């Protein structure tokens, strides 16, 4: 990760995201995960970048309570949260309520929709903003009301090996961007 921080600072990237590691509900490995993320956050601080981690289905940090716990235990100002509503939704939570609870440390946001609460976000075309079950207008509105002005990163996964062409990926991206722009306008952020 040190090389990633060095490269980030050299090319002007202020935020480096990583996964939390560990497994959900595994208290035995929680201290190791927190120590590792804490050490990485201190290293990021040394380089003048922010390390962000997101709640991820199946990982040690996977929902709002575990995100809040990590926020409490990792005190470095270089530690931030990358929020992805699809993981919070699949953890059985309301992403609008979740973002409001952790907004103080949110430094990066992935935006992806999903249908259902399965372990997967679903087929790529169902991840396009507005096609799934997530209240993205409410989510982006909560970000705006909370004062968030950082990056919103559109994300679609699972296209490899499923026959999704480059052109289809571009259509999904364009649809998602258009929906996100409409959400930003609806909540007064644009």
Residue ranges and their predicted role:
Residues 12, 64-79, 83, 89-190:
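Histidine-acidic metal/acid-base catalytic patches
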């Amino acid at each position: 990760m040190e090389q990633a921080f060095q490269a980030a600072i050299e090319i002007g990237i202020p935020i480096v995201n990583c996964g939390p590691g560990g497994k959900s509900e595994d208290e035995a490995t929680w201290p190791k995960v927190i120590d590792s993320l804490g050490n990485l956050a201190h290293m990021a601080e040394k380089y003048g970048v922010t390390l962000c981690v997101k709640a991820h289905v199946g990982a040690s940090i996977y929902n709002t309570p575990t995100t809040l716990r990590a926020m409490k235990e990792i005190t470095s100002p270089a530690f931030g949260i990358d929020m992805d509503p699809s993981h919070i939704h699949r953890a059985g939570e309301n992403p609008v309520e979740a973002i409001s609870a952790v907004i103080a440390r949110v430094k990066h946001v992935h935006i992806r929709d999903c249908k259902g609460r399965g372990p997967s976000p679903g087929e790529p075309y169902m991840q396009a903003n507005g096609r799934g079950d997530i209240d993205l207008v409410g989510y982006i509105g909560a970000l705006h009301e909370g004062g968030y002005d950082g990056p919103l990163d559109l994300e679609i996964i699972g296209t490899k090996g499923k026959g999704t062409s480059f052109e289809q990926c571009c259509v999904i991206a364009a649809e998602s961007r258009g929906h996100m722009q409409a959400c930003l306008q609806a909540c007064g952020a644009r």
